[in-house]
Curated annotation (Swiss-Prot):
GO molecular function: 3-isopropylmalate dehydrogenase activity; magnesium ion binding; NAD binding
Protein name: 3-isopropylmalate dehydrogenase
Source species: Synechococcus sp. (strain CC9605)
Binding residues for Mg(2+): D224, D248, D252
Gene giving rise to this polypeptide: leuB
Purpose of the protein: Catalyzes the oxidation of 3-carboxy-2-hydroxy-4-methylpentanoate (3-isopropylmalate) to 3-carboxy-4-methyl-2-oxopentanoate. The product decarboxylates to 4-methyl-2 oxopentanoate.
Amino acid sequence: MAQHRVVLLPGDGIGPEITAVARQLLEVVSRRHGFSLSFEEQPIGGSAIDATGEPLPASTLDACKAADAVLLAAIGSPCFDSLPREKRPETGLLGLRAGMELFANLRPVKIVPALIDASSLKREVIEGVDLMVVRELTGGIYFGQPKGRIETEGDERGFNTMTYSASEVDRIAKVAFEIAQERRGRLCSVDKANVLDVSQLWRDRVDAMAPSYGPVEVSHMYVDNAAMQLVRDPRQFDVLLTGNLFGDILSDEAAMLTGSIGMLPSASLGSEGPGLFEPVHGSAPDIAGQDKANPMAMVLSAAMMLRIGLKQAAAADDLEAAVDAVLAGGFRTGDLMAEGCTQLGCRAMGEQLLKAL
């Protein structure tokens, strides 16, 4: 029997509530499909600050690096906003990504038929949308040097450097090409090569790698056009590959095609070692502990963990099918509530998901 070690990071706010739901479901599907999951909970973010004084204890990072996969719920609380930036909960996530050497962020966007009317776009535009944004996570303008602010004669100047090496582009492009091979075989690389030298390098490297992935159809699109096309005709996209800054913007734009951030999972991967899987949404401290949280994105993040991190695709299929079945049955948490549906709390939604498995 295959055995997998999973570190759970409940974190802050609604994190513990949605983690409990995901864990129950994972225990059921692992038994059904003949593999074993051992769970270890570790503190991160605000909960870690309360327990240890640090947003990312060394013991948490060590446990994550030794695991087969890491499932994170949510980080952040306004009660820590007065702390120095380097001591706030969010720096725990940044440190975790750096410590685990994660460079590829995956954001799937798939329209759930039962929720199609939740989108602000017309049904005929978004029906059938199923795309993946692959964003480079550790390079580009957010991390490039030099950066800073300087005083000049009678003025002040701020500056950042957008930079990528060929090897950085190659490793993120490899991830995107491999995902495209497993999906519908189309990869659109998004850049600004008409004005940026760094984007010209990006495009050249993607083109150089394309022959190694022969069946994959490769196209290029400027980022301004990509932003427009995502709302004009999102069905044209299969896999979108882009850098850190452009991906930060486009992934959030693509997320809202679904109409609810409460349904969106994500993954962050490195060249080797465990991946980090987490919902896109935040910690929602305003509803924490009130049994109002939507656990769906956490459950779908657990499905991504099974499929990508642990290579248990059949179990992932079961979790995703359970989510679809519960929504098709008219069950909703408050954030998704619509006329004619039945509103449930977090725990009751977890019970419906268990019944649907």
